[in-house]
Design a protein with these regions (language model features):
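DNA-recognition alpha helix
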Residues: 3-21, 53-54
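Generic structural signal for well-ordered secondary structure
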Residues: 2, 8, 26-30
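Phosphate-backbone recognition surface of nucleic-acid-processing proteins
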Residues: 19-34
Length: 178
C-alpha cells in the first residue's frame, strides 16, 4: 500500500503539491511514510477528520441525510499476501506473518457479480468508511483486523458518528455484510 502511495505521488506531482509536498525537492521515501504510519497516533488523525466533517457540515457541503457504509480490505505488507508465493500453508490461521504480528486472516469477494462465488484470502485489516452519499465525502472511518465481520462494527460506527454529527433522520445504504 505504501509503495502504491509513493508511486502515485511520483506520477501525480500536482496531487503531491496539493498534499503539501515541495515538488521541487525529492518526495518522501517508502521508509519515511512507513515510519510516519508506525509512529503517528491515529487519534490525532481521527480528531482532524471529525473537525473537518463538522466544518463541512456547517458550510453545507456535507449532508448526512443520505449516508452509506462499506468496507475495503487492506492487505498487510507481508510475503504471504504475494500472489507469486506458492507456500501451501500461507493462509492457515496458525501461520501468522512475522512481518505484521497484528494483522489477521480475512476473506473478501473477488467479484461483485452475485452469481460468482470467487473469494480471496488475505492477511491484513479492513477499513470501514461511512460516507455522505450526496457529496461522496467520508464522515467516519474505523480500521479493524481482517477477521472482524462488517455487521459487528456497524452500530459502533453509527453511534460514534452520531456522538458528534446527528444522523437520526437519514437514509442508510449498506451492502449485505452490514
Amino acid at each position: 500500500m505504501i509503495s502504491d502511495l509513493v508511486d502515485y505521488l511520483h506520477n501525480n506531482l500536482l496531487i503531491a503539491y496539493f498534499c503539501g509536498f515541495d515538488i521541487s525537492r525529492p518526495l518522501p521515501s517508502y521508509w519515511t511514510f512507513d515510519r510516519f504510519l508506525k509512529n503517528f497516533d491515529n487519534k490525532v488523525l481521527s480528531e482532524i477528520m471529525k473537525t473537518q466533517v463538522l466544518f463541512l457540515s456547517k458550510e453545507g457541503i456535507v449532508d448526512t441525510s443520505f449516508i452509506g457504509l462499506d468496507s475495503t480490505p487492506v492487505s498487510a505488507n507481508t510475503s504471504q499476501n504475494n500472489p507469486k508465493s506458492f507456500l501451501s500453508n500461507k493462509f492457515k490461521p496458525r501461520n501468522q506473518p512475522r512481518a505484521d504480528s497484528d494483522c489477521k486472516l480475512g476473506v473478501h469477494t473477488a467479484s461483485n457479480q452475485t452469481n460468482e462465488k470467487k473469494y480471496e484470502f488475505y492477511w491484513g485489516y479492513k477499513n470501514h468508511v461511512l460516507v455522505d452519499c450526496i457529496s461522496g465525502l467520508p464522515i467516519y472511518e474505523m480500521t479493524t483486523t481482517a477477521e472482524v465481520h462488517d455487521a459487528t462494527v456497524a452500530l459502533d460506527i453509527l453511534a460514534a458518528t452520531h456522538s458528534f454529527q446527528p444522523i437520526t433522520d437519514c437514509t442508510f445504504l449498506a451492502d449485505k455484510g452490514y
